[in-house]
């Protein structure tokens, strides 16, 4: 290759070139979808008047351009990245499930997902919603609400959900667990997660998670109240101690809770449980001094103390005094441990009772539907809004239709099967078959199976016949994809090597391994056969470059092909410079 570059840059070499050789190198590449036949190549000669004005540089530039264009045939599948026009992102729809007492749109006013996507807030209660969920189509929500005496009917596909309402309550005959299932069916992200919302539809089920934490941390770090569960009224015979608190089913805000002072009242309540056809729990009554509530919203913690003024055993009934207390490490451990249940709770609260004997008892944990109390209600709502925006920015990927800039642009393997590009030859990275020797007989000692002759070798046959197959007549279809690397590697040689004779080419090639005499017998028919010497010279030059490059990718078992390639290269140059 170094010799070829030096030889082509010599001005005296161009003067001795036969007519028709330069057009073969300068002819533009034919379309990959319709390969040119040899007759077509010979039908369109090009004038060389402009080329001889600077023979050495013109020939070298034409040859370099031909070599540069070589890998574009197999890599024609690569498409340059087109400039992406800015796409206006649609606003993300946030569905807030809460009553109408709180207008959540004002807490999300001016907030954007990832700083550039608007948030549209839709607010409704569970009773005002209906939906249809699909495997691939997501979830379509139908909303019918009444605002200021006007009925609003709207259908939309939410992107995120904030649950601020209980999905199930036996006391109010409200069961919206089917809606939670539909939202989960549609794969919608939520705060808290829909998985945890569904699990919080049963208080004994949640209490079982508290029992796990109790066994993990111990009674000193996690003082859980002693409780007994009954699936129905039949096992409810008696209680070990009185008074006891009986909780029927799943209810909120103190509903379904009864204080029983003696055995007779206990038996009466058992009959009520039988009529309710539900489960029940009993726990020892704790004479409390005050109630404790520790809430967690994201990474914000608050602790409150509530003291009954009216003297009712339920602190949420009658008059009570509420004040915020210091957040201790003990309280933080409680709420952090509870926030890990059901895959994680972004919003939760732990309720405990501080008895008059100075001991604490954890009685309940609440999720995102917890009521907000204290003087910092507005701050807590703003914290919830910030938490939702943060979760939306993490979970919702904007511009999913726009390809990522980190994705490399390259050829797609599935395009290689198209019929128009199937004639481009093997793709990059795939081994190419090596051609047999030009004009010489097959070697009998070769262990390889017989291979068919390539179209370019059919034109170089001694009989000079036309090729039978019309495929691949253009030079770029015979070149190897690795030829540009070969030309760049040879470009680093010293310029003073240009004075070496032509015979020095054989010193750069590896000696043949076997079958030398067989190939020498085919040299004479090769020199005297073809009726189109100029075309054959250009094709043999291109073919030699292709075979010399593909020999670098051969395996040790193909020494015969390497030797044939070397002989083909020598014969090509011998026929090229014979004039």
Curated annotation (Swiss-Prot):
Claim: Signal is one of the keywords in the record: no
Region (B), start-end ranges: 28-90
CC terms in the record's Gene Ontology section: extrinsic component of synaptic vesicle membrane; glutamatergic synapse; postsynaptic density; synapse; synaptic vesicle; synaptic vesicle membrane
Tissue distribution: Expressed primarily in brain.
SUPFAM superfamilies for the chain: Glutathione synthetase ATP-binding domain-like (SSF56059), PreATP-grasp domain (SSF52440)
C: annotated span: 91-398
Topology term for the membrane: Peripheral membrane protein
Region (Disordered): 15-84, 400-566
Region (J): 399-530
Subcellular location: Cytoplasmic vesicle, Secretory vesicle, Synaptic vesicle membrane
Keyword 4Fe-4S attached: no
Record note on quaternary structure: Interacts with CAPON.
Function field: May be involved in the regulation of neurotransmitter release and synaptogenesis. Binds ATP with high affinity and ADP with a lower affinity. This is consistent with a catalytic role of the C-domain in which ADP would be dissociated by cellular ATP after bound ATP was hydrolyzed.
The protein's name in its UniProt record: Synapsin-3
């Amino acid at each position: 290759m170094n010799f070829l570059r030096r030889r082509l840059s010599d001005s005296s070499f161009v003067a001795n070139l036969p007519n028709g050789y330069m057009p073969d190198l300068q002819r533009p590449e034919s379309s990959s979808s319709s390969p040119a036949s040899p007759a077509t190549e010979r039908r369109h000669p090009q004038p060389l008047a402009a080329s001889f004005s600077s023979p050495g540089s013109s020939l070298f530039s034409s040859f370099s351009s031909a070599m540069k264009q070589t890998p574009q045939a197999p890599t024609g599948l690569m498409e340059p990245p087109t400039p992406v026009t800015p796409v206006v992102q649609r606003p993300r729809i946030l569905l807030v499930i809460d009553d109408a007492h709180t207008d959540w749109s004002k807490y999300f006013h001016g907030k954007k997902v990832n700083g550039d996507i608007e948030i549209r807030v839709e607010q409704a209660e569970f009773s005002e919603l209906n939906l249809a969920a699909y495997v691939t189509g997501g979830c379509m929500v139908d909303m019918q609400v009444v605002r200021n005496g006007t009925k609003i009917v709207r259908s939309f596909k939410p992107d995120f959900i904030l649950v601020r309402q209980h999905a199930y309550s036996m006391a109010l005959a409200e069961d919206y667990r089917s809606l939670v299932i539909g939202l989960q069916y549609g794969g919608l992200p939520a705060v808290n997660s829909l998985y945890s919302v569904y699990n919080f539809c049963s208080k004994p089920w949640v209490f079982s998670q508290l029992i796990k934490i109790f066994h993990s941390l111990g009674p000193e770090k996690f003082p859980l109240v002693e409780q007994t569960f009954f699936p129905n009224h039949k096992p409810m015979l008696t209680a070990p101690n009185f008074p006891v608190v009986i909780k029927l089913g799943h209810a909120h805000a103190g509903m379904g809770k009864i204080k029983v002072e003696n055995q007779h009242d206990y038996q009466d309540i058992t009959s009520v449980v039988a009529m309710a056809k539900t489960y029940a729990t009993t726990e020892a009554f704790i004479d409390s001094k005050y109630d404790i509530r520790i809430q967690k919203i994201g990474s914000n913690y608050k602790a409150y103390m509530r003291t009954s003024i009216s003297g009712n055993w339920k602190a949420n009934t009658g008059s009570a005094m509420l004040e915020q207390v210091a957040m201790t490490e003990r309280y933080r451990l409680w709420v952090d441990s509870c926030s890990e249940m059901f895959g994680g709770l972004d919003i939760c609260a732990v309720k405990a009772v501080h008895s008059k004997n100075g001991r604490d008892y954890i009685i309940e944990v609440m999720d995102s539907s917890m009521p907000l109390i204290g003087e910092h209600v507005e701050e807590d709502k703003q914290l919830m809004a910030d938490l939702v925006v943060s979760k939306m920015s993490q979970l919702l990927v904007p511009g999913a239709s726009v390809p990522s800039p980190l994705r490399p642009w390259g050829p797609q393997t599935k395009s290689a099967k198209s019929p128009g590009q199937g004639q481009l030859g093997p793709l990059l990275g795939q081994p190419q078959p090596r051609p047999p020797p030009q004009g010489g007989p097959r070697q009998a000692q070769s262990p390889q199976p017989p291979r068919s002759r390539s179209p370019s070798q059919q034109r170089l046959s001694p009989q000079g016949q036309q090729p039978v197959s019309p495929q691949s007549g253009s030079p770029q279809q015979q070149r190897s994809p690795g030829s540009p690397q070969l030309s760049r590697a040879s470009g680093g040689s010293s310029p003073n090597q240009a004075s070496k004779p032509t015979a020095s080419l054989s010193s750069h090639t590896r000696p043949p391994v076997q079958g030398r005499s067989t190939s020498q017998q085919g040299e004479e028919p090769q020199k005297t056969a073809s009726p189109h010497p100029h075309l054959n010279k250009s094709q043999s030059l291109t073919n030699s470059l292709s075979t010399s490059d593909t020999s670098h990718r051969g395996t040790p078992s193909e020494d015969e092909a390497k030797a044939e390639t070397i002989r083909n290269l020598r014969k090509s140059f011998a026929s090229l410079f014979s004039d």
